[in-house]
Amino acid sequence: MPDVGIRFRAFADEPTIRELKSQLRLACEIYNTLRWADIYFYQRDGKGLSKTELRQLALDLRKQDDEYKRIYSQAVQQIADRFYDAKKRFLKGLARYPREKKPHKWYSLVYPQSGWKVLETREIRTKSKKNKKKIMTLQLANLGVFKVIVHRDFPLDKVKRVIVKLTPSERVYISFVVDQEYPQLPKTNKTVGIDVGIEKLLITSDGEYVPNLRPYEKALNKTRKLHKALSRKKFLSHNWFKAKIKLARAYEHLKNLRRDIYMKLGKYFAEHYDVVVMEDIQVKQLVGKSYKKMRMRLHDVAFYELRSIMEYQLRKYGKELRLVDPAFTSMTCAKCGYVKKDLTLADRIFVCPKCGWTVDRDYNASLNILKRSGWEPPLAPVELRPLPLVKSQWQGGALKQEASPFRVG
């Protein structure tokens, strides 16, 4: 069964939050010590430390320093596992060698199957009959007690890990990693090609599109004010930290808004299609070639995050994501295959000089994407502009035409 992470908002008293911050700082020190030890043994013996050796070294550090004993022993071993996993990605050529971590960028502690205990669970009265919530009282070893707002049921006996995270916005989240199988959605025997863009978030080969809400661009003036307010404060002063938290909460709001939209999109496509085809876009190359405003919009859309969430949702429900070569998808006529190399970004309508095929350029690209996956797109007559997705089609919430209000603080 696949591991599924379920995240909940949590609350704790001030002493527990202070202890969490202190343990996160100590965890970062242990990680950096393991990193330098691995480099030392590699330079001396020509071989780095194994997973078992890293775990043992982490436990030895805990025995030697009373400060490190404040962290639960198995949470210390998980720090060693985190470094080993990062090093393994480097050895496979997937990432660079793990860098030294900064204390203010170490956000989480991991508890395995032991070290945590549910003390109490009780229901909360809400107006909605569908969205029933519970308050779970969770105790973490050597740390404290947290009140967790549980909005989704999950099997406690199948929990493999518990992760406590303190975000830059000073909010606490508890994640339960559960060994759980999601119910597989029925097969539809349908395949769709998707072209992602900036004007429209995505366009399908069925002639539908999702508008780009541009949450970051709309909130740009307010985030600039928060940046200016932070720069006016004395570095590391009490007011500087308050301004920093306000800015972090603003960005967290935008991040959560975008993630919520992408999760709903992934669920929608998993319900309506068996195979989703997208372009294998190299975002770094695309950003490097763009001008300033275009770069901002590319970062706002976050193509890689969209693709990752789409793949996660499709796999979760037993569906498939395919990636194809993005070269000339907009310039190639989906009807006759002619490549119109003089097509510019300003040309929103594709007119084929060879066969006369006239269609929205993004819709034409989505047809070519579908074609490259091995499926033949239905070239039925359509309007020049694709039709938008209807709100009633959404399951689990409608996609609004405007971003939700931007909140500060």
From Swiss-Prot:
Keywords: DNA recombination, DNA-binding, Metal-binding, Transposition, Zinc. Zn(2+) binds at C333, C336, C352, C355. GO terms for biological process: DNA recombination; transposition. InterPro entries: Cas12f1-like_TNB, RNA-guided_DNA_endo/Transpos, Transposase. One of its GO terms (molecular function) is metal ion binding. The keyword Transcription does not apply. It comes from the Viruses. Pfam families: Cas12f1-like_TNB, OrfB_IS605. In the N-terminal section; belongs to the transposase 2 family. In the C-terminal section; belongs to the transposase 35 family. PANTHER family: RNA-GUIDED DNA ENDONUCLEASE RV2885C-RELATED, TRANSPOSASE. This is TnpB-like protein ORF409. It comes from Acidianus two-tailed virus (ATV).
